[in-house]
Structures are given as C-alpha cells and as structure tokens.
C-alpha cells in the first residue's frame, strides 16, 4: 500500500503503457526484466498449484526489488520536474505496479482491486483484465546483470560504513576501480543517492589511491573509501575492543558448557545443539569484529 501511495502521488501520466526501449534507463530495464521473470515464475507456480511459492515470490519482488531498490533508484528522476527521463520512470512504475497487482489479485482481491482502480487502466475491474504474460522483449539479461553489480557495490559501501559507525549524513568520496568504467561512470548518481557519496571517481587501476582507504571487493570492481576523516578512531577502537571482549567471554562460556561432561550427558540434545550453534555464531561475529579492528588500526 505504501508503494502504491508513493507511485500515485508521483504519477502525472494518464495511460498505462511502456515507453520506447531507447528511452529506458538502466534501472528501468532492470526492474522490467525482474518483473518479466516474475510473471513467468508465478504463472508456472499457479499452473502447478504451488500457491505458497507464488505468494513468496510476489512478496520478495515487491519488497526487495520494487520497494527497496527501484523506487529509491528513480526518486531523483521523479522529484525533478525538468528531468527528461521523469515520464519514462512514471510509465515503468505504473506498468510494473499494475502488473504486480494483477499477479497478486488471486491472493489479495480487495486491496489489489482498490490500488488497480486508482492507476491508469483499461476495463471495469482487475478481475476481468488481461492476466500478465511473459514478454521476450522485456528480457534485458545483460542490463539486469550490470545493474545488480552496481547494487552490490552500493550495498557493500553501506554495510562497510555501518560496520565503522559512519552515519549516512557524513558524505565521503567513493573510488571505483574497474575495467567496466563506462557502467560505473553512468551510475554515479546511484552512489550519491544511496551510498552517501559526495564525489565518485572511476579509475582503471589502483595507482595513486591512499593505502589507508577502506576497500570493498565486489564482482568486477574494487571500491575504496577514504573514511579516515569521518571516523573517531580512538572511540571506535574502544567500542570494538569492548565488543571483542564480550564475544570472547561468550565463546568461553559456551566452550565451558560443551566441555562439561555433566552438562553434555544430562542436557537434552536440542539444548546441546543450540549451544553449538551459539558458539559458531559468536566465532563468526568475533571474526568480523577482528576484521573491523584491523581496518580501524590501518586508517
């Protein structure tokens, strides 16, 4: 409902249609390709009466692809009345949301009808509208792969900044080292909007990059973040060492239990397995904390 409300608030178009292919931006092709795959998968699930799987795929698409990514990616275009690609974003938003409501209608008839009625449409009811079908013309496999590489880079930056307690309000330079310079030069706006970048530099090699810059490796690229000026090094090291001490204490406690013959012989197997799982989790957490300490000390 929130996604529908956002879409409706930003629509000025009066019909539901797809724009010409040459007007589609990378993020448009990505969401259309993901939606097209969803149509094929859900149709196949319905044919096999795999209703639970169909609903799960619809849920994942709406939240993970449409809401979490596409809407965020196109906000700059929608909010800029002078942007020549604004109308294209509107058409794609409407097309994908309308089609997803049709796919979801068998499971949620009332709310999907209500949303569909507020979108540009043909016909009296979603119930008698043409059910979406797979369209080979919307198979943008290469563009989908390219967009997802950029998304992984954005996610990697956000995760690393979060690990180092750098708030989104503190902007930093982002340096991308990649052979695919064209893709990343054309994607700078995504890093500025979604990864708190105030400058994006795309380079073919690492020459001249500060050795203290934090690096993130993703498929096809290596990202460098010069975060030294944005982090209170002493305060962050104090926090990380405190967390390290707590985790080491938890690991010692778990190991003590599991090495206690009395506990192992008397405790239910389920409880023993739970303690083993805790030990694995704490060791993984400790490994990440140690990596963060190492990164911080090298700043």
Residue ranges of predicted features:
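Feature 926 captures the class I aminoacyl-tRNA synthetase adenylation module centered on the KMSKS loop
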Residues: 1-299
